[in-house]
């Protein structure tokens, strides 16, 4: 099993370790709900070094990424980040990614842990006709510092000059400090930062954050936080067999430049013209019970929907889920232990900055 540079720190903190995409990762440090609530109210830190930063450099870096990705990196200013999907030729989602623009000739992409090898292979396969170099940065670690007090904590562990620059970062912007990259991004629905730094320096940084008020959080809390925020998890909410249209991600596909071609565009436009017969929704179970991935949602006209992610929401204290359902259907119910329980369909976003949206 693969280990991140912080593996020994997790063991020392009595973390419960699990296999996540071939990596030994902390699922929690004792209480998933406490870790979740701490991120909503204070500051939690996550080791996400199982994800991979890949640098795309060269005179045709922008041209290549405009072809590779469904969102348009030409819209990005330097030191800005963008969410988007990478599609195959059938418009199936290969991965969802954050792309960071350093300069016109240098971009950084962070890919999901389960797709590290396949994504890099896809980059290389499609880069052959472009003047670009693709460099997986395997000597970098990634730490997410998340929560309303994230900025206070991170300011305590850096110099005053750097603290001022970090505090001034806008959402989806970033800055390099030597080999460290600090981005105001995250996967929790809270303010926070993702810090990409050399593996040789990550333990000292992690320990400094803990000494200055942060609490560690595992992948369990990361999952319930992102679910409350309505953020997709690759492999659960979407995969290679689904297009952005079917998963509420059409907003991330940029069609504004009709002259730009990108992988999957033709198939995507055909699917868009044909229309999809499902919609992407949030699901709330008002009574006791738990929503889980794979559960069916039944409607009174006989049609069905399916939950792709589900859990108890520590913030809302009810069970919530993400699902795709028929566009026209009424009176949704789920079957839990032989009982039909009513669910409410809502917008697929439940919590923002600690506050309920439902």
Curated annotation (Swiss-Prot):
Enzyme Commission number(s) of this protein: 2.1.2.10
Domain of life of the organism encoding this protein: Bacteria
GO biological process: glycine decarboxylation via glycine cleavage system
UniProt GO cellular component terms: cytosol; glycine cleavage complex
Signal peptide annotation: none
Keyword Cell inner membrane recorded: no
Key words, A-Z: Aminotransferase, Transferase
Single GO MF descriptor: transaminase activity
Pfam families: GCV_T (PF01571), GCV_T_C (PF08669)
Annotated disulfide bonds: none
Catalytic activity: N(6)-[(R)-S(8)-aminomethyldihydrolipoyl]-L-lysyl-[protein] + (6S)-5,6,7,8-tetrahydrofolate = N(6)-[(R)-dihydrolipoyl]-L-lysyl-[protein] + (6R)-5,10-methylene-5,6,7,8-tetrahydrofolate + NH4(+)
Keyword NAD: no
Family statement: Belongs to the GcvT family.
UniProt subunit comment: The glycine cleavage system is composed of four proteins: P, T, L and H.
HAMAP family (alphabetical): GcvT (MF_00259)
NCBIfam families xref list: gcvT (TIGR00528), PRK00389.1 (NF001567)
Protein name, as recorded: Aminomethyltransferase
Native source organism of the sequence: Francisella tularensis subsp. novicida (strain U112)
Gene that specifies this protein: gcvT
